[in-house]
Amino acid sequence: MRCWVLAVVTAVLWSQCIPLGWAEGRKVPKRLKEGAPQHTEAFNTTLSNSEELDGSPKQVGENQRVDPLGSWMDFVKRPVGNFPGKCRKRKRPLPGPPGPPGPPGPQGPPGAPGAEVTQEVLLREFKEMIKEATERRAAVDRPSEPSQLPTALITLEGMTSYRRIEEAFHCKLKGPVVVDKKTLAELQNFQTPPAKGAFLRGTGMDQSTGRFTAPVTGIYQFSANVHIDHTEVKRSKSQLRARDNVRVLICIESLCHRYTSLEMIVGLESNSKIFTVSVHGLLELQAGQYTSIFVDNAAGASITIQNGSDFMGMLLGV
């Protein structure tokens, strides 16, 4: 009787366990399939020695929760550079066109005031412009072959060197002047010849007295050509001595020994009837001082200064 009761209970229990086992068998694979992509383990899960030695995969229980911190640590500690091939071969997108320009910035502070432009600076720049323009024009107009009449190119600097001479003269003696023996005579009575070429500029030259008075202090150039007739000396040739000579001087204030003078000494041994004594040089005159020509006859007979003897002078500079 007992055996029959046990057999009935066993059969009932067996009939109830078969459907439950079949359902569990269908559930477990689906759960494993869903959990395959996210295989994580609890941060505080401890494995036994037998589980560590066994290489079988771990099975997560149904009631075991996933640790977020452990999952994050696994993500952080993943190997770098192990990306799929598709990500590595993907081309970066090209940059787009540049955007519109931004608005202008604020105005900066005012600069320092410029240099003061004076009249001298403007004049110097104007001279440089004229010089450059003249050089360019000369380079363009220069002929390939030399011509007989070259074009005169006068620059602004060159014009300053050809300034007008305010004081200058060229006059000649009107008539003959006799100078006695052992006599120092001053030549006077000059005139400006009517022929072209002679000139008289300024008011410094007094032709009646033969004296030129300096209007300003400066350097002056003087020249004199004195034509001498020594016929009387030749007639008395027996009396001619070695010390007989004629001196022509251009003196300052008629003081030939006190001031520097221009001097020329000539002997009387010439065979010609008339000879010329020329003297020229530079003198510095103060304003108001005058110069004139003196003839010193040291011979034993008189001599005659011929008309046409000339006296020239000009102001070189202050």
From Swiss-Prot:
MF terms in GO: hormone activity
Regions of compositional bias (Pro residues) in chain numbering: 94-112
GO cellular component: extracellular region; extracellular space
Location relative to the cell: Secreted
Glycosites: 44
GO biological process, one term: regulation of D-glucose import
Signal sequence coordinates: 1-23
InterPro entries (alphabetical): Adipolin/Erythroferrone-rel, C1q_dom, Tumour_necrosis_fac-like_dom
Domain of life, per lineage: Eukaryota
Residues covered by the C1q domain: 162-318
Ranges for region Disordered: 45-115
UniProt-listed Pfam families: C1q
UniProt main location, coarse: secreted
Keywords tagged on the record: Disulfide bond, Glycoprotein, Hormone, Secreted, Signal
Known function: Insulin-sensitizing adipocyte-secreted protein (adipokine) that regulates glucose metabolism in liver and adipose tissue.
Subunit composition and interactions: Homomultimer; disulfide-linked.
Family: Belongs to the adipolin/erythroferrone family.
Protein's UniProt name: Adipolin
Organism of this sequence: Danio rerio
